[in-house]
Amino acid sequence: MKKHIFIMMLFALCLTSFQAHAQRYLPGMKGLQVTAGMADGVHWNDNTDFAYHIGAAYSVYTKNANRWVIGGEYLHKKYDYKDMQIPVEQFTAEGGYYLKFLSDRRKTFFLSLGLSALAGYETSNQSEKLLPDGSTLLDKDCFIYGGALTLELEAYLTDRIALLANARERALFSSDIGKFHTQVSLGLKFI
């Protein structure tokens, strides 16, 4: 009897110690992600220079758990002027490469560093250059280009859905409004 109990305990131990983990970050896998967040600081009321962004991207995984990313983003920011706020909007396309540099043993959490090229269009005050007080807005609508450096954390909720948290610094050298924008966002990725 003791022999049977010992064999069953050994079998149960083998079942729990050699668990198979989900297949994640394999070459050729594809994912679609949606993110939203705040830019240039955290402002919770409408009376400040509140800024937000939303974006969508498509990822293709390569060797060593790295990935190519292509996507688009919309950034909206308000600038104070006298007793009004002037909206600035940026529409950008992104193409970049993300390098995974840290993950846990169970492949639940992944930390990646990404470098992207950005290009798009920037508009000030919805292209209205004459302000209500008679002033003329000198900032012109223009094409913008630059890059972004991103630190991204992926936490897998299921085998096909991951929660994203990222921080990124965008540098847009041809912008009339601001060259640098810091963004913090949350999102979901569907594999």
Explain the meaning of each model-derived region.
Residues 1-29:
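Cleavable N-terminal export/targeting peptides
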Residues 3, 24, 28-30, 64-66, ...:
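Short coil turns and loop connectors of transmembrane beta-barrels in diderm outer membranes
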Residues 21-70, 187-191:
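Short glycine/proline- and aromatic-enriched beta-strand/turn motifs that initiate or cap beta-hairpins
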Residues 28-30, 48-54, 87-93, 109, ...:
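Residues that define the transmembrane beta-barrel architecture of outer-membrane proteins
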Residues 41-44, 79-86, 133-139, 170-175:
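Extracellular loop and loop/strand-boundary signature of outer-membrane beta-barrel proteins
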Residues 54-56, 93-97, 113, 149-151, ...:
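Membrane-embedded beta-strands of outer-membrane beta-barrel proteins
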Residues 57-131, 190-191:
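Gram-negative (and chloroplast) outer-membrane scaffold detector with strong preference
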Residues 75-78, 147-191:
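Predominantly the C-terminal beta-signal and adjacent terminal strand-loop region
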